[in-house]
Amino acid sequence: MAAAVAEVPAGERGATRVADRVVAKIAAQAAREALRTAAPDTRTDAHASVTIRRRDDRQSLGEAHVRVAVELGYPSDIGAQCGTVRYQVAERVRALAGMEVPDVAVEVERLHSPLEESAGRERVR
């Protein structure tokens, strides 16, 4: 039995496919991790959508084009936070899913102001 397996070339034995929703979950979690690191005291949230372009060869898992929507605290360095998210998402998807990530689009859905949050806690007379 072992001799029969050894005769089949590695590329013809099968392939691993990572589902789009799994890559989206990895990307969203990576974005949340990046935001917690960049602004630990600020309320943040993130979710992601992914488009995967699969290649015909079995040696590659394909490319993941990621779009991440985030909520950030304000005032803050929004550009730096988006850059941190972009880098972290690309690295985590590459490491955990084995896919190349040529681009990560970061969309800021909402900004949270400390004044807005404290206004909700004030007592009404």
What feature does the model see in each segment?
Residues 1-84, 95, 99-125:
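Contiguous, often N-terminal, cationic amphipathic patches that form binding interfaces
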